[in-house]
């Protein structure tokens, strides 16, 4: 299962060199975790026995940028629907504005993208009784990864199991 951003530059099938039908892909701006998306992950993991969920974010994510813009200049979004995405991203990035990262926009965006990926992965791990049971009972793994638009490389950095000795 891949929960990814709706950005057209990050099609999971191409990123992971898979054919159509090989992946269960769920896409939404900023890979925000809302109830319908959790239900989709639960469906794939429970019904099809999928044992890996990848939360795939990417560099320069527009949803993260929109959230940072809103936090820096409140009142920018006139769309309640876009505001709902910003509101889901906000908790994972707003504390970064109180750090020295606020002085370096590129570093802030890089860390905010990763914080949002971590938050989405954590929400899946701990925000669903079904997924929690699958993690405990069946070895489901939820990992966070970032796709670099610049290099085409995916870096797995959150929730990656330690290699067996």
What are these regions (language model features)?
Residues 21, 30-50, 62-165:
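Divalent-metal-activated hydrolytic enzyme cores
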Residues 53-59:
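Ordered, amphipathic secondary-structure segments that act as subunit-interaction surfaces
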Residues 1-32:
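Short, conserved "active-site rim" segments that organize catalytic pockets and cofactor/ligand binding
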Residues 2, 26, 55, 144, ...:
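Divalent metal-coordination and catalytic microenvironments
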